Amino acid sequence: MKITVLVENSTSCRLYGEHGLSVYIEYDGKKYLLDTGASTLFAKNAKELGISLADIDTAFLSHAHYDHSGGFEAFFKENDKAEVYMQDTSAENCYFRTETGDKYIGIPVQLLEAYKERFHTLHTVCEVEKGVWAVPHSTENLDGMGRRAHMYRKVGDEFIADDFAHEQSIVFETEKGLVIFNSCSHGGIANIVREVQNAFAGKKIYAVIGGFHMMKLSGLDTL
């Protein structure tokens, strides 16, 4: 397995950075993309690194936020074959709510409709390719974490605390053990590890990679 971060919130003199994440993964002779960051910067960085987006076989959307889905239109322009797997609860309805107002933080509006033939939805633990699994949340009452983070979903005219049912982990089986990718871990990294342990009973976890959203936080409840 080879992992290359295409974009994140830190950078070098050669590459661009932004608030968001995109990861390129080579595994068992195939090429995978996890998220596309917030814009086209992931594609610019891929070109600088000599990575061809056209050669990617399969892609994943970790969850329904703009900073992980904002570059998919650029990806589709360069790649005409890869299917994108997401949870069936993913929609264009995520908001950040504070006393000063509501800010839309979801998937770019109308992206899912415009490219509906490229997006495929899942709703349970699923082996997408040999040794590559999508694992949704199974922990209950995660809406409390959404409420604390001021994150909500708009359902009709009502705002509901986000329980992050649209978030999924991508798990690769390797000789050393399971490698878990979760781009933001909104559902709590401890919950995520436990969910994977339950889904793969008896299998060793070798690594957990992604974003944990733990900066400036304290206390075990943030895990």
Language model regions located:
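Metal-dependent catalytic neighborhoods of phosphoester/phosphodiester hydrolases
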Residues: 70-79, 103, 218-223
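Active-site metal-binding motif and surrounding structural segment of the metallo-beta-lactamase
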Residues: 41-92, 198-209
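Conserved beta-strand hairpin/beta-sheet module of binuclear metal-dependent hydrolase folds
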Residues: 1-49, 163-182
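Cap/insert and terminal regions of metallo-dependent hydrolase folds
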Residues: 66-68, 83, 161-169, 173-223
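Active-site environment of divalent metal-dependent phosphoester hydrolases
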Residues: 13, 41, 65-69, 91-94, ...
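Pre-active-site segment of Zn-dependent metallo-hydrolases
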Residues: 16, 30-58, 146, 151-155, ...
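Active-site-proximal loop/helix segment associated with metal-binding centers of metalloenzymes
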Residues: 98-102, 112, 124-176
